[in-house]
From Swiss-Prot:
Organism encoding this protein: Pongo abelii
Polar residues biased stretches: 532-554, 849-858
Protein name, entry field: Heat shock protein 105 kDa
Protein's job: Acts as a nucleotide-exchange factor (NEF) for chaperone proteins HSPA1A and HSPA1B, promoting the release of ADP from HSPA1A/B thereby triggering substrate release. Prevents the aggregation of denatured proteins in cells under severe stress, on which the ATP levels decrease markedly. Inhibits HSPA8/HSC70 ATPase and chaperone activities.
Family (UniProt): Belongs to the heat shock protein 70 family.
Length: 858
């Protein structure tokens, strides 16, 4: 079973896996642990990762990058429209209103959704993990920013489903970092002590996130999170690009923004310059050859100029930090440590601002690039039954407050209730009880739209169906279970109607039995490890009761314990009288929970038909990539064979082919090379396979002759040594050597016969081989000589290694030192000396066991 953590970033990705020795970040086929989040489309296949980034400038229009933030957003989203201006590829609206990415693939124009593009990247990460683990990868944990909304999280889950990944959890970036930090700490306070507060700061390529976490032994709780979704390393790059665009326009009269390739080159060089300025404070040059119109451009920048240029961005760093302390009601003095991760935190000015705010040195004990992936892998190992991990509970936080709105039964007024406040513990479940006579709707939305970096506050509309009044006309009690699951997604998991059914007196089935028969497990039984009782909201609305359940590590049931006790008093009286003889015959009441279907209309969720179509399309593209790779491998094999043999025919292979064949083969190799670069440039795989077989018919015998000429003398030498060894033993046997006089003469004759036969065979084949030229096939091959050596050893070795029979020597009686004493006298002496000091004989001391004392030795 695979245990994989995936950190899917805006600029790059990291893969961490759990092995027997711990968590390891694995490398791709380029021996790089960083895989760029780039997909390039060509006329034959897709390239993903490092190969795609290498051709980002030459194939700018068909290379897709920086698409992570497009998840779950509509095309007319203001953020999409702003980002569209800076992209090298085209964005178009899809039929469902989402963002479509238009590229040329396989010679045709294609539209791909963001889910499909992310699925392509996940395909590459999955392939890299499988190549490292040598087994299929299915289960994984994927990281998402903590500010991702319900729609964005559902979109990422759809992308994972397209590629066949079972995402056990969508884990917030900062929670993954905190888990990676805390699980290895051995000095955390115990559960009954004050927790250690640690603040984690992450500035990546496109976003800035901070979180405060409380640590106890074996426990992590996220107290709060804050963020700026539009502040990251990319913004610092943009400041440099704007500066040099203006400088080049003045200095060289070149408008870099007019050509996308020039602009992309400038972005790459500015990113390199930014990294160099992190370790150098002096002036650093920026040089680009043939930038535009065959002109070379140059510029320079130092760290102080860079910080002055980015002063506005640096001021934004403190805003999320203040927000975090305000949310969590913490003071700077309460923070034990500040840990930074993310590539952009390497900028000295960023580190200085963070350290100055908290008034303490910042810590860099975690790997800034790989911390998120490692935390995801740890979470996957905790969730996987295949690994035994130190017990460590993780309680996340809800980033945005969530409320429900509904219409009152037969009234025009609406009811509103905040079910999850900001930074509420997650995952968490609550039960709401409604009094209704018919079906009703619940609409979930974010209570604070201004604080959500998403234009739509609505989460979804949920219709509870098949609700009916009681037989006596009273309203039915409908229990609705709302939940924020392990992915951070809000859902209404179950709904049930409490129905009172009259029964005959002789029916003795209990209410508990009927409830068990009518209950069924929830559709998504996530494990609530950190749920707390919360009844503070109960009674805020006349028709709503809010309950929470203190759940264990078993999946929560749809019927909560705290709710079962809230039965009308009349019903309780009837329950108490079940076992008592009735004064008069009255119908008994049974309470039955009837499961109700829920229709969910979400703001963002791919339909099943569309999802299946995406899965099929991805499968076809994976197969096309595989076929193209096999075709390229076959073509490269022909090209490699041509170059290898042409060099060796004029070198070590020259003596092993006759002159005429030598010239013909060289001519064939040259013709094959010309064919590869002309009509053979784009052929089917079989054409290259046939061409390679044609070359190998001539080249393989030459290669074999060379290899045989190298190996044959070594094998003859080894055979000669073995023959000499056994012949010497046979001669020693004839000379009556004591070492071999135990061997039977008939056995030794077998050795002599085998030695003579093999020696005769060796002399014959060596003479025959000496008469042949090197350009002829060998008379005897090295493998045949190796077989002869094995046969010789099998015949002779058991005989010559026979051990000599052992001769038993007569037993000698041990005579003690000193005069012989009669046995009876010895016994008497022993009795008289009972408890005395043990005797010393031959320098040995025999301890008296009865008087021995157990001692502790240092």
């Amino acid at each position: 079973m695979s245990v994989v953590g995936l950190d899917v970033g805006s600029q790059s990705c990291y893969i961490a896996v759990a092995r027997a020795g711990g968590i390891e970040t694995i490398a791709n086929e380029f021996s790089d642990r960083c895989t760029p989040s780039v997909i390039s489309f060509g006329s034959k296949n897709r390239t993903i990762g490092v190969a795609a980034k290498n051709q980002q400038i030459t194939h700018a229009n068909n290379t897709v990058s920086n698409f992570k933030r497009f998840h779950g957003r509509a095309f007319n989203d203001p953020f999409i429209q702003k980002e569209k201006e800076n992209l090298s590829y085209d964005l178009v609206p899809l039929k469902n209103g989402g963002v479509g990415i238009k590229v040329m693939y396989m010679g045709e124009e294609h539209l791909f959704s963001v889910e499909q593009i992310t699925a392509m990247l996940l395909t590459k990460l999955k392939e890299t993990a499988e190549n490292s683990l040598k087994k299929p990868v299915t289960d994984c944990v994927i990281s998402v920013p903590s500010f991702f909304t319900d729609a964005e999280r559902r979109s990422v889950l759809d992308a994972a489903q397209i590629v066949g990944l079972n995402c056990l959890r969508l884990m917030n970036d900062m929670t993954a970092v905190a888990l990676n930090y805390g699980i290895y700490k051995q000095d955390l306070p115990s559960l009954d002590e004050k927790p250690r507060i640690v603040v984690f700061v992450d500035m990546g390529h496109s976003a800035f996130q901070v979180s405060a976490c409380a640590f106890n032994k074996g426990k992590l709780k996220v107290l709060g999170t804050a963020f700026d979704p539009f502040l990251g390393g990319k913004n610092f790059d943009e400041k440099l690009v704007e500066h040099f665009c203006a400088e080049f326009k003045t200095k060289y009269k070149l408008d870099a923004k007019s050509k996308i390739r020039a602009l992309l080159r400038l972005y790459q060089e500015c990113e390199k310059l930014k990294k160099l300025m992190s370790s150098n404070s002096t002036d650093l040059p920026l040089n680009i050859e043939c930038f535009m119109n065959d002109k070379d451009v140059s510029g320079k920048m130092n760290r102080s100029q860079f910080e002055e240029l980015c002063a506005e961005l640096l001021q934004k760093i403190e805003v999320p930090l203040y927000s975090l302390l305000e949310q969590t009601h913490l003071k700077v003095e309460d923070v034990s440590a500040v840990e930074i991760v993310g590539g952009a935190t390497r900028i000295p000015a960023v580190k200085e601002r963070i350290a100055k705010f908290f008034g303490k040195d910042i810590s860099t004990t975690l790997n800034a690039d790989e911390a998120v992936a490692r935390g995801c892998a740890l979470q996957c190992a905790i969730l996987s039954p295949a690994f035994k991990v130190r017990e460590f509970s993780v309680t996340d936080a809800v980033p945005f407050p969530i409320s429900l709105i509904w219409n009152h039964d037969s009234e025009d007024t609406e009811g509103v209730h905040e079910v999850f406040s900001r930074n509420h513990a997650a995952p968490f479940s609550k039960v709401l009880t409604f009094l209704r006579r018919g079906p009703f709707e619940l609409e979930a939305f974010y209570s604070d739209p201004q604080g959500v970096p998403y234009p739509e506050a609505k989460i979804g509309r949920f219709v509870v169906q098949n609700v009916s009044a009681q037989k006596d006309g009273e309203k039915s009690r409908v229990k609705v279970k709302v939940r924020v699951n392990t992915h951070g997604i809000f859902t209404i998991s179950t709904a049930s109607m409490v129905e009172k059914v009259p029964t005959e007196e002789n029916e003795m089935s209990s209410e508990a039995d009927m409830e068990c028969l009518n209950q069924r497990p929830p559709e998504n039984p996530d494990t609530d490890k950190n749920v707390q009782q919360d009844n503070s909201e109960a009674g805020t609305q006349p028709q709503v009761q809010t309950d929470a359940q203190q759940t264990s590590q078993s999946p929560p049931s749809p019927e909560l314990t705290s709710e079962e006790n809230k039965i009308p008093d009349a019903d309780k009286a009837n329950e108490k009288k079940v076992d008592q003889p009735p004064e008069a015959k009255k119908p008994k009441i049974k309470v039955v929970n009837v499961e109700l279907p829920i229709e969910a209309n979400l703001v963002w969720q791919l339909g099943k038909d569309l999802l299946n179509m995406y899965i099929e399309t991805e499968g076809k593209m994976i197969m096309q990539d595989k076929l193209e790779k096999e075709r390229n491998d076959a073509k490269n094999a022909v090209e490699e064979y041509v170059y290898e043999f042409r060099d060796k025919l004029c070198g070590p292979y020259e003596k092993f082919i006759c002159e005429q064949d030598h010239q013909n083969f060289l001519r064939l190799l040259t013709e094959t090379e010309d064919w590869l670069y002309e009509e053979g440039e784009d052929q089917a795989k079989q054409a290259y396979v046939d061409k390679l077989e044609e070359l190998m018919k001539i080249g393989t015998p030459v290669k074999v002759r060379f290899q045989e000429a190298e190996e044959r003398p070594k094998m003859f030498e080894e055979l000669g040594q073995r023959l000499q060894h056994y012949a010497k033993i046979a001669a020693d046997f004839r000379n009556k050597d004591e070492k071999y006089n135990h061997i039977d003469e008939s056995e030794m004759k077998k050795v002599e016969k085998s030695v003579n036969e093999v020696m005769e065979w060796m002399n014959n084949v060596m003479n025959a081989q000496a008469k042949e030229s090197l350009d002829q096939d060998p008379v005897v091959r090295a493998q045949e000589i190796k077989t002869k050596i094995k046969e010789l050893n099998n015949t002779c070795e058991p005989v010559v290694t026979q051990p000599k029979p052992k001769i038993e020597s007569p037993k000698l009686e041990r005579t003690p030192n000193g005069p012989n004493i009669d046995k009876k006298e010895e016994d008497l002496e022993d009795k008289n000396n009972f408890g005395a000091e043990p005797p010393h004989q031959n320098g040995e001391c025999y301890p008296n066991e009865k008087n021995s004392v157990n001692m502790d030795l240092d």
